[in-house]
């Protein structure tokens, strides 16, 4: 059973770094796969919080195993800058980084980035699909051994192992490559959520992890449908993990029952900042008794059973 915790750090009273560091350490001690941090507040103009990737870089220095996933919008960032920032986080964390890209629009966010009226659903979907493809290919712009740093021979890199993106699409033009080395786990983990029916094929082609809404009677059918789409895209069904979103008050027994019905690969537990203490004191000990005793490796991909580089 794979377990993630997600925390919107803009909800409620702002959290200090010491609070967040303590939470990350407790989650790691319990063996959870990853923390997903969201720093956006679509309905509140008065929110204040750290920027997610910057915060996760700091949390990487006080943890050593748990995955560190930043929510980052395709509206609020240019693909080159975001790819570079997440690749840097992956290097800093020794292969534990991930990107949570939501397929849902946030009107307030769009208004802050020169799109006061947002995008139509179709345009947003096409733009997001192009954006994700650019980021993933930028991450693959250098082979693992492409950078030589050969001072004597005067060679910075092996040209045969550098791959220019040279992308010219409907919405973006990006030449590449990144000025950051290849990620320790090949590419950071891509997490998608906010999926409509039309978005599921995008997820099947590109995602490593899919977050779906709270468990329902058709959870098993949704799980099987996604896995069929993954196979239809030429991928192994295990290449995409489906986690169901649940609340912080969920009972561990209920998770175990739902997981045994083969309706998902695990769960993403959404925690309001005000509920952190209760979650650490009541829920984490129960989860710790039910998950693996230790991490199988050091990289997020190894925790999730996904193919990649350093494990």
Region spans (language model):
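Hydrophobic faces of well-ordered beta-strands that scaffold small-molecule active sites
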Residues: 3-7, 35-37, 66-72, 95-101, ...
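Glycine-rich, proline-tolerant flexible connector loops at the mouths of alpha/beta enzymes
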Residues: 34-52, 213-220, 268-281
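N-terminal small/glycine-rich loop or linker at the start of catalytic domains
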Residues: 1-15, 107-112, 161-195, 239-249, ...
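N-terminal beta1-alpha1-beta2 module of alpha/beta enzyme domains
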Residues: 1-63, 187-188, 298-299, 307-311
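Catalytic domains of carbohydrate-active enzymes, especially glycoside hydrolases
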Residues: 18-40, 200-213, 257-266
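C-terminal helical cap(s) of enzyme catalytic domains, especially alpha/beta-barrels
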Residues: 113-120, 131-136, 219-227, 273-296
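Long hydrophobic segments that form regular secondary structure
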Residues: 171, 178-232, 236
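Flexible, glycine-rich active-site loops centered on histidine and acidic residues
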Residues: 6-15, 78-161, 217-218, 272
